[in-house]
Amino acid sequence: MKKILISCLICICLLVVLLVGASFYMVDYALARRHTTWTEEKAWQRLEEYYPWTMEWMDSIRANGVLKDTFIVAEDGRRLHGYYLPRYPKHDTVSVARTALLIHGYRNCAIDMMHLGYMYHHSLGCNIVLPDLHAHGQSDGESIQMGWKDRLDALLWCRVADSLFHTPMVVHGISMGAATTMMLSGEENLPTNITHFVEDCGYTSAWDEFRGELSNQFSLPAFPLLHLTSRLWDAMYGWTFTEASAIKQVARCPKPMLFIHGDADDFVPTWMVYPLHEAHQGQKQLWLTEGVDHAHSYRYYPDEYTGMVRQFLLP
């Protein structure tokens, strides 16, 4: 009996060690900056491949050096990097929002949002601001924050945009940037100059996204690994994966929101957009793009996308 008890205790200890080790691995695999190989130059190359109609504008922007970069300092001392581009002085717009804050996705960088920069700047006549999120691009940080900590950095960028341009603004994000946008939207201290939000293929929560990827990539259930990993992350960074909830923040959002999602998205699965849309209690629109996978709605429907956003931003 004593030998059986000792054997059981050893097995339990080994299981705990295995789970803790797996949790550290998951944190490192999914969220450590050191695994990001994406660069700004790769982003420019992908833009040329996916959005060739924007190249004349982008080449002009780069050749003339009018895309300005800047750094700001967060309250905790982190340096955050971003780009901005003023609207053409003679470019008229009917949009109520004259400035767009454009937020990139997971393991991307600010330059990845230049296709929407083209849409807002060239097609809609807006100023644009494109931040590098925490642990992305030229911003400080070693671990990706899945939008939750990023929402507070985005709030800083909204204030920077207001100090630069003094105009009403729209916040528009893609993928993790869309989750950041939605998480920002429920903050109590939103700047009054934010008039609209646009989220394109964002997830309901960090928990839901990780649970799906754990199943898809490793064929593992959420329990117990994801629960333990979330606790580990909380000890490291002060928030859990369930706390990082876009759906709870959207329910508090007082501003109009446009929801966009590809109906063939299996990375942030399409089903997520429905509870998000339902949670928003104010003015809202939902647009599903037919046959589109993750984050490619503007790529395959550029005219319709531009028209949808233009119509949404009408006063």
Residue ranges and their predicted role:
Residues L14-V73:
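An N-terminal hydrophobic leader/cap segment in hydrolases
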Residues A74-W157:
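Membrane-embedded segments
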Residues L116, A246, K255, P269-E278:
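Short alpha-helix in the alpha/beta-hydrolase fold that links the catalytic acid
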Residues L152-P168:
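Conserved acidic catalytic loop of the alpha/beta-hydrolase fold
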Residues M183-W239:
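Hydrolase active-site cap/lid region
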Residues R252-P254, F259-H261, D265:
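Short beta-strand/loop motif that positions the catalytic acidic residue
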Residues D263-V268, A295-H296:
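Acidic catalytic loop of the alpha/beta-hydrolase fold
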Residues V292-P302:
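Catalytic histidine-centered segment of alpha/beta-hydrolase-like enzymes
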